[in-house]
């Protein structure tokens, strides 16, 4: 097998090795009692936020093929869209500092394009592989492929998913792990636990219920790692297989287990807990945090938490324990909140005892952990802002009802906005095409561009709110109650303040090592004040990860350091590939028989 030196000489790994700022001996080895160590003098205190600070790495390659197959994760058959014929998609894993080269093949026969987003991966100075049709690329046409290549300068647990409209809600996602140090010790790694809500109908069909102004469709079951249960009778419904199973894992007394809870849902923010066990939170969204203990956790769509669970349960009532997850706002919206089983006795196949649902779990609410709980291990101080942040600059979340739209001439469609306009991107002319053109091109208002033409290292602040006076907004909207998991591409952000109720000017920002992450839950009728450093040129999406809301336009795009974008793409030698892919998509799209008045039936993202 080639050595690391061979990889570097061959030019396959873009190597930049900087001082690790390690606090531990250089010979410290990662193990059950030394998880803060990593390798080559790198450890939990090494400043991963600097993309130049990463260990030496190797090349790791994967192939992902997109197809439609019949799946029945909860015992009910339906057509799913999946990677490599499996649901969820295969685990993609690498080590901190590695370069991943992932080739995506679109073998769909239903006419859909596709593109893959590497959720939470910073993609420093490689915006063109962020995988957002209409923003960073044209879709991959059926029968064609695309190579995504990036270096893992962060570590932790995340996921990858289609960013082509609602495609991932039909099953097109999988877990992603970048191995690195941990802020607390553990013995056994149980890997990612993907938690999702599940439907028996196609997501593109269901979306029209929401577009018509009705409440978003309610899922029928909850899945943990692609397994769940749905109450049906095979004798009455041929789609019912009668084969239902919970996700199960085995614990050994006294062992400490690490796992990562990853919310890959379409609609629901989940409250998660394990009967009879506390757990220690050690990471949130690729940001290692000082360990803290709890027994219940809210996980918004797109959020990830690495936790450590010690196998020390009181087994007087039995040796098996339920894993639970329910919707944070209405616990009974899916009647069964049991999503998995932990067994101390592998031979025991009985159902665990079911303790009464505590008020703590039922009324836990929809808030993220408190700012005082999520303390980053690698400390950062937020600098002064360079942008305006008055009330007229707030990012006001709301639903716009019964208005004409670029993609639907019948003015009965309900949309969501994160600014003044619901987003609508054109798959044939993505933002990066405009930014790399030989002449200046205007961004249509429905692409919702927000230009960040500031120097590297300067900070921008933004206030997200779903609780404000309607007199303060340009376009009418309804303050429909909902949790909004807001995700930023290309960065994580600092959370300066967060809460319920309206934001008031007397609220002071937390600037000294505030929590950092890439998805923040704006609670029902609440706000979140975020900030990030301008240092990664590109067109980066900010959007609600509630899929129906994103589909209905709840997004904007930051055009960051626009003058640096084209030189980066040219220097990387990918400008021709980018143009060829768009030309290929246009040829395919123009050859498809699509009615003139229905070219694209949602925001595109």
UniProtKB/Swiss-Prot annotation:
Q: Which residues of this UniProt protein bind Cu cation 1? A: 117, 487
Residues that coordinate or bind Cu cation 4: 484, 544, 549
Q: How is the cofactor bound?
A: Binds 4 Cu cations per monomer.
Question: Which positions bind Cu cation 3?
Answer: 163, 489, 543
Needed cofactors: Cu cation
Q: Is the keyword Glycoprotein assigned to this protein?
A: yes
Q: Per the UniProt record, which EC number(s) apply here?
A: 1.10.3.-
Quote the pathway field.
Secondary metabolite biosynthesis
Where does the Plastocyanin-like domain start and stop, copy by copy? 65-183, 189-347, 424-567
Q: Does the keyword Cell wall biogenesis/degradation apply?
A: no
Q: Which residues form the signal peptide?
A: 1-18
Query: What are the protein's UniProt keywords?
Result: Copper, Glycoprotein, Metal-binding, Oxidoreductase, Signal
This chain is glycosylated at 27, 107, 112, 278, 467
| Residues reported in the UniProt entry to bind Cu cation 2 | 119, 161, 545
Swiss-Prot/TrEMBL catalytic activity: 2 dihydrogeodin + O2 + 2 H(+) = 2 (+)-geodin + 2 H2O
From the UniProt record, which GO molecular function terms apply? copper ion binding; oxidoreductase activity
Q: Which Gene3D superfamilies match?
A: Cupredoxins - blue copper proteins
Q: What does this protein do?
A: Dihydrogeodin oxidase; part of the gene cluster that mediates the biosynthesis of geodin, an intermediate in the biosynthesis of other natural products. The pathway begins with the synthesis of atrochrysone thioester by the polyketide synthase (PKS) gedC. The atrochrysone carboxyl ACP thioesterase gedB then breaks the thioester bond and releases the atrochrysone carboxylic acid from gedC. The atrochrysone carboxylic acid is then converted to atrochrysone which is further transformed into emodinanthrone.
Family, as annotated = Belongs to the multicopper oxidase family.
Kindly provide the name given to this protein in its UniProt entry: Dihydrogeodin oxidase
What is the protein's species of origin? Aspergillus terreus (strain NIH 2624 / FGSC A1156)
**What taxonomic ancestry is recorded?**
Eukaryota, Fungi, Dikarya, Ascomycota, Pezizomycotina
Encoding gene, per UniProt annotation: gedJ
